[in-house]
């Protein structure tokens, strides 16, 4: 089992797909990493040699932020926006959509389940 950036890659999958199990690596960046490391994307994870795994690990370490470091950087960016009090930071703090979406009807993912408000008695 190949272990890269603290993640065990699935043995049966192609390395091109297996790398996407690491947070911060998608299909495009996976192919870019494999090209730099000189590894065939169609190779199964179980068939990789230790040298190939080491090459892939080196390329990832020198060029990308992945897993915990990436999560930490994203959290710090959001925290910074909240501290400076900009519009995006306020939206993050209130748990509302940040990128200009309308909130009159939808936005349930960001707002959470509906909370029904009781009507006033006449």
UniProtKB/Swiss-Prot annotation:
Lineage: Bacteria, Bacillati, Bacillota, Clostridia, Lachnospirales
Keyword tRNA-binding assigned: yes
BP GO terms, sorted: translation
GO CC, any one term: small ribosomal subunit
Pfam families to which the protein is assigned, alphabetical: Ribosomal_S13
Annotated region (Disordered), positions in chain: 95-122
Function: Located at the top of the head of the 30S subunit, it contacts several helices of the 16S rRNA. In the 70S ribosome it contacts the 23S rRNA (bridge B1a) and protein L5 of the 50S subunit (bridge B1b), connecting the 2 subunits; these bridges are implicated in subunit movement. Contacts the tRNAs in the A and P-sites.
Subunit and partners: Part of the 30S ribosomal subunit. Forms a loose heterodimer with protein S19. Forms two bridges to the 50S subunit in the 70S ribosome.
HAMAP family: Ribosomal_uS13 (MF_01315)
NCBIfam families for the chain: uS13_bact
UniProt xrefs under PROSITE patterns: RIBOSOMAL_S13_1, RIBOSOMAL_S13_2
Keyword Cell division attributed: no
A molecular function (GO) term: structural constituent of ribosome
Family: Belongs to the universal ribosomal protein uS13 family.
Protein name stated in the entry: Small ribosomal subunit protein uS13
Keywords: Ribonucleoprotein, Ribosomal protein, RNA-binding, rRNA-binding, tRNA-binding
